[in-house]
Amino acid sequence: MTQDKPESAAASALAVMERHLHALNGLRENDLADTLHFPHFRLVGTTLDRWPSAETYLSDFRARAGDNWARTAWQTIDVQRESADKVHLAVRINRFDINDQLIADFDSLWIITFKNGKWAAQFRSSFAA
């Protein structure tokens, strides 16, 4: 999916995050993959995860989130810095179980970039358990 480079990088990054959340909660793998650049990276503690392609991303998420996971919500998203082709977002993430009980609450830094004709998440660093 090729997108025009918009006037506001921050607005584009926030739109990526909205699409990512809806695709994740709907378990729509193709839509989710469209919100990520590959290879995609995630730093948790000192462990760097790398997904070279979309094929294993969603199954890996299910393993990370646990069997109790039912949905994710962004508690807050704040633009930290933006340039014409990169945006840093500070995100507070909540995960909920099927009874809508909070099962995870953590901060994450997302880096959304415009490359290969589209805005998508390239990297994130999370303080997840």
Predicted regions and their residues:
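Short, well-ordered beta-strand segments in beta-rich or mixed alpha/beta enzyme
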Residues: 20, 32, 42, 86-96
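Short beta-strand edge/turn micro-motifs at domain boundaries
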Residues: 103-129
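Short beta-strand segments enriched in hydrophobic/aromatic residues
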Residues: 36-37, 93-95, 125-126
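Short, low-complexity N-terminal intrinsically disordered segments enriched in polar/charged residues
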Residues: 1-38, 55
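Hydrophobic/aromatic beta-strand elements that line small-molecule binding cavities or substrate pockets
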Residues: 74-80, 92-95, 107-113
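A short, structured loop/turn motif at beta-sheet edges
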Residues: 79-87, 113-118
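A solvent-exposed, acidic/Ser-Thr-rich amphipathic alpha-helical stretch
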Residues: 29-81
